[in-house]
A protein has these predicted regions:
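Metal-dependent phosphoesterase signature
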Residues: 1-20, 28
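Asp-based, Mg2+/Mn2+-dependent phosphohydrolase catalytic module
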Residues: 23-26, 39-40, 44-150
């Protein structure tokens, strides 16, 4: 018996409309940040493989933090690094724990529907059907802030 390690093609599972929305946000002057529980190695691997790394101004891994989501530590750490206040940002999350972490950090959160998982997203400020819907919500809100965590 043999096994071969297969490389996952992350672009195949990239959220639809991400490649449309990221350039739109950057063109409007928004700064984008990833605040993920994944390792920095994995964050960089995925963003490079999908050709989206250059859109992000900051990438934060929660691996080195003592607490993980739903604890707000990763969001509080990112706010500290960027010298921002919670009211200056908005997060797009899909998981229950991610939404709870945003709430714990007093950050507004758009929940992107997670069809693959049975996440409770009721605590989010609003639920978007996909990333394009989240982008349209942001435009509707006409936010003056210019930082987003995803």
């Amino acid at each position: 018996m043999w096994s071969k390690e297969l490389e996952l093609d992350y672009c195949m599972i990239l959220n639809p409309h991400v490649l449309y929305v990221l350039p739109k946000l950057k063109a409007k002057g928004y700064k984008l940040t990833i605040a993920s529980s994944s390792s920095m190695e994995n964050i960089k691997k995925v963003t490079r493989q999908c050709g989206i790394a250059s859109y992000f101004d900051c990438m934060v891994s929660g691996v080195d933090l003592k607490e993980s989501k739903p604890d707000p530590a990763i969001y509080l750490d990112t706010l500290r690094r960027l010298n921002l206040k919670p009211e200056e940002v908005i997060a797009i999350e899909d998981s229950t724990y991610g939404i709870q972490a945003c709430i714990g950090a007093n950050i507004r959160v758009i929940a992107k529907e997670a069809n693959r998982y049975d996440f409770n997203q009721d605590l989010a400020d609003v639920i978007a059907s996909d990333i394009l819907d989240a982008y349209n919500i942001i435009k509707y809100w006409n936010l003056e802030e210019n930082y987003f965590f995803v």
